[in-house]
Curated annotation (Swiss-Prot):
SUPFAM superfamilies: tRNA-guanine transglycosylase (SSF51713). Binds 1 zinc ion per subunit. Keywords: Cytoplasm, Metal-binding, tRNA processing, Zinc. This is Queuine tRNA-ribosyltransferase accessory subunit 2.
Length: 421
């Protein structure tokens, strides 16, 4: 894995090119960029064929230990790695410990292992056990075992223990990586921990310096508990820590930061020098039955009336026969309407989350194209201001719907929602 910086702007972050290859493909992506958040080896709600409508480029797929550990025996038997096993052999696989879309469960941490909660319950992973799984998965890129279960509320004592454990785990995983014949083509990225404590962040970066020849990049972790917690982060606290950390990291290595950050937070992180994010935000919005509609065209004259999202459960869309976003060219917006999406939700059709996910991913990737354009022109502050003018929409409360004004053609009982006999 190689990272090349193309330009560094004064106030808008940096542009770069990340080149990654595996046995089947050689992928080059422009940064700031996105990796595809996967669950169980697949993009949620989308088949491989539908995914090809979204992007013709070879994807970088983010696999998490929490929803793939049950595959270990089968992947080991396959002997071609997790990408081939899940039917995306040409994709670049990136293995992380925990799913950024799932809230971390509080748990007791021991010095010798990291608890992982998967579909089969809690499992305690030591460095040795973790590297056995990594050898079976043969990921293109992976992070060593680390203790990053910290957030703004974590005590200094907890943060210190997180750093101490992470240092031990990283040493053991790096040593195992050096000795492994199966992982010679796998790239290691270093986890930077320390919560919101700047001194511990600096200590974490300093510790990783000794492995600079082993690490192809860095991942800033330990700032939130995954899931929706990332959408609720306080901007000022987050930016201070990320800015401090990025200033300490080598400039020639790629920087990852995963989590369901809001578009406004994403822009702040890009400005600080983060290069790669994931699509868990688009997935969580799909789970909430919401379509992303925020504008990233700074020439949009109607920005003051724009809403950042729309909720397909809202009855006001029942007779809106236009796509989610007027100018959107995704398959969902060109072939379907808000009214149809609202109908699909009401009838609990499986197609509803599919077209939502198609649109949300497309919209999010287009957003990052706009980000790269503004970084190249050093005008990211214009995009920040543009987003701040738009209105956030609260979650729709289905209990607020007046059942006395129900659709006369709805043959379901208003109380039970079952078909009337």
């Amino acid at each position: 894995m190689k990272f090349a910086i193309e330009s560094v702007s004064k106030c808008s972050g940096r542009l770069g090119t990340l080149n990654v290859k595996n046995a089947f493909s050689n992928v080059s992506i422009s940064t700031p960029a996105l990796v595809l958040h996967a669950k169980g080896g697949s993009i949620p709600f989308l088949s491989r064929e539908v995914l090809q409508y979204l992007t013709a480029e070879t994807p970088i797929m983010q696999h998490s230990l929490t929803n793939t550990d049950h595959m270990e025996e089968a992947v080991r038997a396959c002997d071609e790695g997790i990408s081939s096993f899940v039917g995306h052999k040409e994709s670049i696989s990136l293995l992380v410990l925990k799913d950024p879309a799932e809230q971390c469960k509080p748990s007791f941490h021991e010095k010798d292992f990291v608890p992982i909660f998967s579909r089969s319950g809690r499992k305690n992973f030591t460095s040795e056990r973790y590297m056995q799984l990594v050898e079976a998965f043969k990921p293109t890129v992976f992070v060593p075992l680390f203790d990053g279960d910290t957030d703004l509320e974590s005590s200094k004592k907890r943060l210190q223990k997180s750093l101490d454990r992470t240092e031990k785990f990283v040493e053991q995983c790096v040593e195992a990586h050096r000795k492994s014949a199966n992982l010679k083509e796998s790239n290691l990225i270093g986890p930077v921990v320390g919560g919101y404590n700047l001194k511990l962040r600096s200590a974490s970066v300093k510790f990783l310096e000794q492995f600079k020849n082993d690490l192809e990049g860095y991942m800033i972790a330990g700032l939130h508990s995954n899931g929706l917690s990332a959408t609720e982060l306080k901007e000022s606290n987050l930016v201070e820590v990320v800015s401090h950390t990025c200033q300490s990291l080598p400039t020639d290595k790629v920087r990852f930061m995963f989590g369901a950050f809001s578009p406004r937070i994403i822009l702040k992180l890009v400005a600080q020098g983060i290069d790669v994010f994931d699509t868990s935000f688009a997935y969580l919005k799909t789970q909430q039955n919401r379509a992303l509609t925020f504008s990233f065209d700074v020439n949009d004259k109607n920005v003051d009336s724009r809403e950042t999202e729309l909720d397909i459960r809202d009855p006001r869309w029942a007779e809106e026969f236009t796509g989610f976003v007027e100018s959107c060219s995704c398959l969902a917006c060109t072939k379907h309407t808000k009214a149809y999406a609202h109908h699909l939700y009401n009838t609990r059709e499986m197609l509803a989350p599919i077209i939502l996910m198609m649109h949300n991913l497309h919209h999010y990737f287009e957003f990052f194209k706009a980000i790269r354009k503004h970084v190249s022109e050093d005008t990211l502050d214009q995009l920040v201001e543009h987003l701040q003018k738009q209105k956030d929409v609260p979650l729709f409360d289905e209990k607020s719907v007046d059942v006395t004004k129900a659709d006369p053609m709805d043959f379901r009982d208003s109380a039970t929602k079952k078909l009337k006999v």
